[in-house]
Amino acid sequence: MRTRVIVNGANGKMGILACETLENHEQFEVVAKLSRQDNLGQSILDTKAQIVVDLTRADCVYENSLTIINHGARPVIGTSGLVETQIDELTKLCKIKQIGGIIAPNFSLGAILMMMLAAKASEYFSEVEIIEGHHQQKLDAPSGTALKTAEMIAAARKKPKNKLPLKELTLGARGGSHHDINIHSLRLPGLLARQEVLFGNIGETLSITHNSIDRRCFMPGIVLACQKVLNLTNLVYGLEHLL
């Protein structure tokens, strides 16, 4: 028996590839391909979907996630834009419902390894900044990957960090700050997804960079998330917990 999956946001570039990947996988059956005009909750009931892969937009991902959980399906969220308070609320809801779920700031396994390496390196470097770049159709900033990277670094850091008393001559010149880590966001044609984590110590720097050059790099992570989520009874934030 194949696992029944809905792809929400199926008409986008990521959604089209996700549908193609899951349809060609022996473990899954794509029972609905939804776009913004479709009723997500009703589709879950009609198809008895076990998993909903959400690849929509930042302005609707929270409501979509609530709908998925409240209708008894397991969310696999690949849409950025969720803030920490929303993730906390979704975590509580999954616990109450005893439903597994996954929020993946990035489905690329290479990007996950980059984040894990950055967290490890932060134990030995006192200073770090994040530079992320995406295509111009990505309208939220910073990226979910950058936010998650900052959170992983902040959790792992042992050395004190300096907050330099600089005066910005142009507002925002030093980027935004998340967990006291500066993040700089680029939105340029020619980019798909790129992130550099740049560390500095006295007399040396260390750069950890990941480039996504084709959206197909995200597909193994989507398959992994759909395979693992059925065995979860809680919400997991980040694919690094599944590797």
Each language-model region and where it sits:
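Rossmann-like NAD(P)H-binding beta-loop-alpha module
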Residues: L113-F125, A141
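Structural motif
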Residues: N8, L55-T56, G78-T79, A104, ...
